[in-house]
Every structure is written in structure tokens, then in C-alpha cells.
């Protein structure tokens, strides 16, 4: 029987930063944004210090409400390194669903972007949920309805009243010395909760599922082993990171095998095809509707997909007939 790893997510990240520092880890092909393992690990450490500076610590719940933006993974690993719990928030949530999750999870810090349904959509929903935020000093939020909530972070350069932005979190991290970060890292155990994912709530209220470093890293590792992943692979990830498909089967697979994670911020069949073509991806994840959209795209024949050797098609079965037709 294969022995399971007891490394934490932070251990894995630092392992590859030491052994393959100059190899590309995170790539956004359309933005030409690229992080090597060393560069990404350093950014995560800076962000972890910033979170410590605003009171995030071991056991603190930090929500991430965003599409697949570049710093989504930064915040995930920053939480992991200091023992905090990343709470993944569905990007399709409406006001009531967001409020339920924030209350139920005892959320301390919420990281957001503008949103996908109009300018400042998420920002306005957060202000509606936390009316005290606009008049609060950053880091000192006192909400009657959400007593655990102390911080809101805007992922990006824009500034909103009562919220930190990414640059300010990184700047605050400069006040935390290396020893304090090392002390926080040393307390993290592989059996600590690192991620809380909420169920769909089909037959009742969604329930927060508490997942450990040991749980999700080994899940991703074994998935990759079945797919014969190595550090030479490049996985194109166009599925949402808030879902287990993105944050576990994709991200943890890449993390535990040292391979490159080619990110697509929001699903677009043309962008997926272009990313696979440009980066010579060897694996692609998606659901049947995504694969059908890619295969039926009028520009499909313009792209070279020959580098692909494996992938995962999830959700529902893709009939042999349809596969044969394409």
C-alpha cells in the first residue's frame, strides 16, 4: 500500500521552492503572468506576514470570494502556512447565501474581488451585509450581526472604504519579522483544518466541511498518481478554485507533483484553447459542457492540442457516441 504524506501545504510549497526554484509553477498565459516556485513561495510568505499583522492566526477563518484571480492561490497558501483556515465561497452566491456562510463559518476575514455580475457587485453586497464597514477603521470592524468579522480585503489595487487592498496587506507584513512567521509555521500540523468547503445545500442549509492538509494534499497526490503526473506536466485549470475540482483535484495535484498550473481566470473556450496551445499543456480539466464548447469552437482547428495526454471530465458522463463524433 502506498504511504500517505504528512507534509502540510506549506511544506510542499517550500519543498519545490528549494528543489526546483526556477521552474514555473503558476502561469496566466493571457496576462503573461508567471511565477516560479521560488517567486510564488516568497509572495506567499509576504502575504502570510500581512495576515498575521491584521490578526489572522492559527484557526482563524478567512473567506475567499473571487474567481480564479492570481492571488486566490496566494491567500490559500498564506492561510495554510500560518494555520488559518481558507473558507471557499461560491462566486454565484447571492446576498442571503453570503450572509449565511459568513455567520455559520465564524468568518474573521473576507477577501473579495469586484464580482462577475456587474461593476462593484461583490463590494456592494459586502457593504449591505456590513453597513458599519464604511465608517470603520480598517481592522477594527465591529458588526452586530457578524461579531467574528474583523477585516475585509479587496484583492487588487483599488481602494474601498473600510477595506484593505492587496498592496496594503503586503506592506503591513513588513512589520512582522521572520521569526514570528517561522513560529507560526512551526505550530501547523498536517491534521489541522486548512480548508472549509460548503455543500450545495440542495436539501437544506449548506454545511461546512472541514478538510485537513493531510486530506486534500493526499487526495490530489493520489489523483495525480493515477494520471501518471510528473513535474514535467502542465495542467490547464479552467474550473473554479472555490470548488473541490479546482482547489483539490487540480491545485493539490500540481502542488504534490511539482508541475505547472496554467490558470484560466474565467471559463472561455477560446482562452482555454489558446492556453493549451501556447503553454503546451499536457492535461486539461473540465465538465462536459466545457469540453463540448472547446471542441465545437469555430477556431478549434487553429490550435495545436497534440500536447494533451490526459485530463479529467467531471460531473456527468460523456457518451461514447458524442466522444466518437468529435
Residue ranges and their predicted role:
Residues 12-36, 156-160:
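AMP-dependent adenylate-forming
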Residues 21-24, 145-149, 153-160, 164-198, ...:
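Conserved pre-ATP/AMP-binding loop-to-beta segment of ANL
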Residues 25-77, 94-99, 103, 165-174, ...:
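Conserved AMP-binding/adenylate-forming core of the ANL superfamily
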Residues 34-38, 185-187, 191-218:
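Conserved AMP-binding A3 loop
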Residues 54, 82-171:
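Structural core segment of the AMP-binding/adenylate-forming
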Residues 112-134, 239, 265-270, 281-322:
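Adenylate-forming
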Residues 199, 319-326:
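Conserved small/polar residues in nucleotide/adenosyl-binding loops
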Residues 217-234, 242-283, 293, 297-298:
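Conserved AMP-binding/adenylation subdomain of ANL enzymes
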